[in-house]
Amino acid sequence: MPYGLKRYQQAESLHFITFSCYHRLPYLSGPESKHVIETILERTRLRHEARVYAYVLMPEHVHLLINEPPNILLAQFLKSFKQTTSRKLKGSREQFWQDRYFDRNISGEEARSEVLQYIHRNPVKRGLVASPGQYEWSSYNHYATGVRGTVEIESEWTARHRRTHSSQ
């Protein structure tokens, strides 16, 4: 939960969330831990009817562009997600996640587009890959190809898929 920051909560409002591993240690460096994170993010998204617009799993932190779920506070959504992943991945570690997270309300298409680009370029900026499409642990390839990964991404591709399947 962010301390000392005002949060403007509104159903369906869009949030750019960043949270880190305990002491910013690279607990997410291996593919196994990233796969667990993606799987639990999708389960939590489904359970609370949240819409994920973008994400990236970095070695020591996570970025999400997500809406305020309709039936639960975003803080409760994140608590549920972090507790579940922590139980699954913690092992002998004292703590898996930092307690706090950063939350920035996003309004307008320009701000949304900037955050989307920032999230997808994060692995390139860090030198993990040469281009966003080479990084497996983000929503970039969904936007580039429309292929659904482990986490359902809210996009034009997804909306088109829903319309096609609901009319059948």
Describe these PLM feature segments.
Residues 1-168:
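Short catalytic/metal-binding and nucleic-acid-binding patches
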